[in-house]
Structures are given as structure tokens and as C-alpha cells.
């Protein structure tokens, strides 16, 4: 036991990468088990249609222009599809999961460089993987946000790196280059992050005049040239740039206070910090160590921590004032909190002995409760869809026991033992919860229906008839489109007409045509053939 703790104390970098290596199977097991859901099918559709149409400049869904997001992430996903020759859920999620690990590594190295305390770097990087939000939700979805946030966080770090060296050209050039890339991922939020970060840093340090320097202006022009080159190429295929830009603006502004009113916004602002502390649990337990009288002076006296605090508050208010902000929009800001919390933990835990003791009892108590709960998996009929259930339960129980014992016995590394337990919880989630969801989810029924329709209609036109979904229904319909197109490797089309020969899919109506033959009914969805 002492040898393990001695290793963790002497070689924090090796400990970090060892835990990262152990985390690989934890997050990758059963990654492709669930059908696509939420925003995943939208990203997958755009990438797939680029491949089918051989047009990578113009995002489309169902052959119609898709304006909500620029295409950089879709290019990455399409590249993976082509590289692997595979259009599975597993491959669809790789552009999110691989950057998640790269993000953790980036946090580790940047914190190691700027703070020179690898304990803080290890904890900050690992907390990105094991906070509640990432542990059981974002880490299993092929969303754009982890990749986007990784690039944005990298820009934050490069800005400070070049600021410290007073290399103004490289500060502006590299951050604007990343802004161009992130704009081509997600649109206007990238401009907001770049603008607020630069203005806050330069205003606080008395360097606002640098905004008018040739170095800043040239870098900004370079950014606009990259973005402009994309839109110029896009214009060759679709001259409706106004519709594209208006939609990108609407996507960025639709969740703001102007849409929801003063009362709803006020209530949201009150619950915002508590809600996100919940999303980040158990990492947010480290807030306990921020209640030391030296906490704020400690931030002010450290140039890097002060910068982190400045850019956090410079950017967070936009989301604090925007009802219905989704936690994944803040993934580039969460590591700033993990960094500050980790610094507080290692700096003030010896000065707050009662708090430290309470914290240790909390994580030990949570570990014991989790360990005792593991055998309950044997009583939920999981054997219907989990092979070797008893063996897997024994494995998870043993791993939880080992981690709990380490937490109990360690003197200085209890938190790393707890992180080991959290990774074990995620492994249990992958082994038990994901198969349970896959077995019971209605999405499997519709996935099978879409694949069946794809096989039946192969080689012939396929139309979605009078397709006018509400916003909340779009992910459901996009999922159907993806599985149909993946099976056919041809685009579906949207139509208001019912006289063309081919196959028709209707959502809320019959196909009133003498030549229409009803082939299948999938609950309230109908599949017709018109000859």
C-alpha cells in the first residue's frame, strides 16, 4: 500500500497516464451500442450526405441545405467514415471521444507548465473525465462540443502563453487561427469567446491599445480570410448566403434572455450555479477548499490563476443570462474551475484540517455506498442482455472494494483512489446500463424500421412526404434519415408531391393516391410505394 502511494507521490505524470490508459476501455466498451440520439444523427446525416453527393462544401440533410452549423466537424466525421469504411455508431462517436482524452492531456500539460505542480495538473486533467456530466452523458455521445471546446481551451492557453512572453503577433495569430477553425465548427460563439477573452485580458492589463495594432488587425484579417474562403466556395453551389448567415445568427441567439423574458431569466440565474455544481459533482466537492481566507488573495497573486479567473468571468456571463443553456456548451470553461478547485485542494487542505477530514469521510462514505450497491445488479434481470453477468458483477465489486480500501489506507492520495472508483463506476455503466438502455429503448425499433425501409427501397427514389417536423422532433426524424441513407447509400428527398414513382414515408397522414400501395406501418409511421 505504501509503495503504491509512494509511486503516486513521486511520479504524478506516470500516475496520470496510467489512469488515462485504464480509462480507455472504461469509455470505449459498448460505445457503439446505443442507436444515435439527440444531435448525433444530424451530424452523421450531414457527413454521410457529403460522401454520397461528393460535395463537401455544402451541408445538406435530405438533399436540402442545412444552415445551422458550418461543416468542419462534419468533414472530420466524413473523413473517419471514409478512412474506416464504416458508418457505425461507434465511428460516429469517435470524433468526440478521442478529443475528450486529448483534452485531458492538454489540461495536464498546460497546468504542469504554468503552475509547475504536477499534482494539480493530474487532478485537473482527470476531473475533466470523471465529473458527473462527462462520466455518464457527454462521453457516450458523438456531439460537436467536446472537439469544439478542446480547440477553444487550447486558444485560451496559447493566449496566456504568448502574453507572458509578450509575443503579441503570435498571441493574436494563433488565437485567431483557432477562432477560424472553431467558427467553421459552430459559428458565432467562437467570435464571442475570442472577443471577450481578448478584451478582458487586455483591459485588465492595460493593453487595450493592442487591439489597434497591425498585429491584431492582420491576424483578424487572416481569420476572416479563412472563413471567407469557405463561404466563397460555398457560394459557388448555393448563392443564398444570407439565409446561411441569418440561421447561424439565430442558432447563437435563440436561447438568450430576450427570448424568455425577465422572470424566467431571473429564476434561471439563481439556479444556474447550483445546477452546474450538480452537473460537475463529485468534482464540485472541492469547492469546500475554496472557503479559506487566502483563496481569493492566492488567485490574485498567481498570474496564471488570475488569468483563468478573468477569462472565466469574461465568458460565463453570456451563458448565465441565457435560459436553456445546455451544460455541454460550457465544456471549455469547466476545466478552468477544475484547475482552480484543484489548486485550492492542494494549497489549503492542510490549513483546513476539519474540512479535509470531512471531505475524506464524504468520499469514503460515497465509495462504501457505491460498493455495497454493486451486487444489486444481479436482481434486475440484466442477464437477458448482459453476458457473463455474475462474472462482471464480481469484477466490478472487487474493483470497487480495492478502490475503497485504497481511499481508506492512503494518507495523501485518497482523491486519486476516489477517481479510480469513479472510473470503475463508469465501467459498470458501460457494462450494465448501456446494454439495459439498448434493450429497452424504442429507438431500436425505429432504427430497425429505417434499415428495413432502406433495404426494400434500394435503387429507387425515396421521399419523405410533406415533411414539416417541429424543432423537438428533428432528432427523431434525422435518425430515421441517417439509417435509411446509410442502408441505401443514396439520399432521401423531401417532397410535397405524390405523383412521382418511388417510395414514400409519411408521419401524420395517409398517401391519397390511387397508385399508392401501403407496404408497412411502423406504429404511426407509414411506408408506401407508388408505381
Please tell me what each predicted stretch does.
Residues 13-17, 107-130:
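Transmembrane-helix signature of polytopic, membrane-embedded enzymes
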Residues 24-28, 42-68, 72-75, 254, ...:
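Extracytosolic helix-loop segments that constitute the early lumenal/periplasmic catalytic or substrate-binding loops
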Residues 94-115, 154:
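Transmembrane-helix motifs of polytopic, lipid-linked glycan transferases
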Residues 139-147:
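Short acidic/glycine- and proline-prone juxtamembrane loop motifs at membrane-interface regions
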Amino acid at each position: 500500500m505504501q509503495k503504491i502511494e509512494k509511486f503516486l507521490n513521486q511520479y504524478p505524470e506516470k500516475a496520470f497516464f496510467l489512469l488515462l490508459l485504464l480509462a480507455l476501455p472504461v469509455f470505449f466498451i459498448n460505445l457503439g451500442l446505443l442507436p444515435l440520439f439527440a444531435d448525433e444523427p444530424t451530424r452523421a446525416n450531414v457527413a454521410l450526405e457529403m460522401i454520397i453527393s461528393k460535395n463537401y462544401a455544402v451541408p445538406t440533410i435530405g438533399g436540402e441545405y442545412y444552415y445551422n452549423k458550418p461543416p468542419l466537424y462534419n468533414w472530420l466525421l466524413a473523413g473517419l467514415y471514409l478512412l474506416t469504411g464504416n458508418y457505425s455508431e461507434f465511428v460516429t462517436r469517435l470524433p468526440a471521444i478521442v478529443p475528450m482524452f486529448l483534452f485531458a492531456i492538454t489540461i495536464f500539460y498546460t497546468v504542469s507548465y504554468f503552475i509547475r505542480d504536477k499534482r494539480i495538473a493530474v487532478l485537473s486533467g482527470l476531473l475533466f473525465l470523471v465529473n458527473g456530466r462527462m462520466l455518464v452523458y457527454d462521453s457516450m455521445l458523438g456531439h460537436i462540443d467536446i472537439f469544439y471546446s478542446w480547440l477553444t481551451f487550447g486558444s485560451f492557453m496559447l493566449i496566456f502563453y504568448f502574453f507572458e512572453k509578450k509575443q503579441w503577433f503570435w498571441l493574436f495569430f494563433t488565437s485567431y487561427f483557432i477562432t477560424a477553425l472553431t467558427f467553421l465548427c459552430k459559428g458565432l460563439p467562437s467570435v464571442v469567446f475570442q472577443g471577450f477573452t481578448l478584451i478582458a485580458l487586455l483591459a485588465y492589463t492595460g493593453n487595450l491599445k493592442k487591439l489597434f495594432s497591425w498585429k491584431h488587425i492582420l491576424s483578424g484579417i487572416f481569420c476572416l480570410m479563412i472563413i471567407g474562403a469557405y463561404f466563397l466556395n460555398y457560394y459557388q453551389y448555393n448563392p443564398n448566403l444570407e439565409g446561411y448567415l441569418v440561421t447561424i445568427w439565430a442558432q447563437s441567439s435563440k436561447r438568450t434572455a430576450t427570448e424568455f423574458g425577465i422572470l424566467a431569466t431571473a429564476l434561471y440565474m439563481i439556479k444556474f450555479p447550483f445546477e452546474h455544481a450538480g452537473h460537475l459533482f463529485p468534482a464540485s466537492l472541492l469547492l469546500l477548499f475554496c472557503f479559506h481566507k487566502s483563496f481569493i488573495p492566492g488567485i490574485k497573486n498567481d498570474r496564471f490563476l488570475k488569468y483563468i479567473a478573468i477569462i472565466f468571468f469574461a465568458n460565463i456571463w453570456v451563458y448565465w443570462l441565457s435560459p436553456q443553456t445546455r451544460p455541454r456548451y460550457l465544456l471549455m470553461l469547466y476545466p478552468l474551475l477544475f484547475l482552480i478547485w484543484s489548486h485550492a485542494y492542494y494549497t489549503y487542505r492542510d490549513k483546513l484540517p476539519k474540512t479535509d477530514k470531512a471531505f475524506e469521510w464524504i468520499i469514503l462514505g460515497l465509495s462504501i455506498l457505491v460498493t455495497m450497491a454493486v451486487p444489486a445488479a444481479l436482481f434486475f434481470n440484466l442477464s437477458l442482455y448482459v453476458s457473463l453477468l455474475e462474472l462482471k458483477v464480481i469484477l466490478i465489486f472487487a474493483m470497487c472494494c480495492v478502490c475503497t480500501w485504497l481511499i481508506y489506507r492512503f494518507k495523501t492520495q485518497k482523491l486519486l483512489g476516489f477517481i479510480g472508483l469513479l472510473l470503475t463506476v463508469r465501467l459498470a455503466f458501460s457494462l450494465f446500463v448501456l446494454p439495459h438502455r439498448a434493450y429497452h429503448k424504442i429507438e431500436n425499433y425505429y432504427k430497425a424500421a429505417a434499415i428495413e425501409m432502406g433495404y426494400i427501397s434500394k435503387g429507387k427514389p425515396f421521399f419523405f412526404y410533406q415533411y414539416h417536423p417541429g424543432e423537438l422532433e428533428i432528432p427523431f426524424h434525422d435518425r430515421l434519415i441517417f439509417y435509411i441513407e446509410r442502408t441505401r447509400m443514396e439520399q432521401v428527398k423531401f417532397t410535397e408531391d405524390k405523383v412521382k414513382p418511388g417510395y414514400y414515408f409519411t408521419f401524420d397522414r395517409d398517401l391519397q393516391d390511387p397508385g399508392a400501395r401501403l407496404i408497412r406501418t411502423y406504429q404511426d409511421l407509414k411506408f408506401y410505394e407508388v408505381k
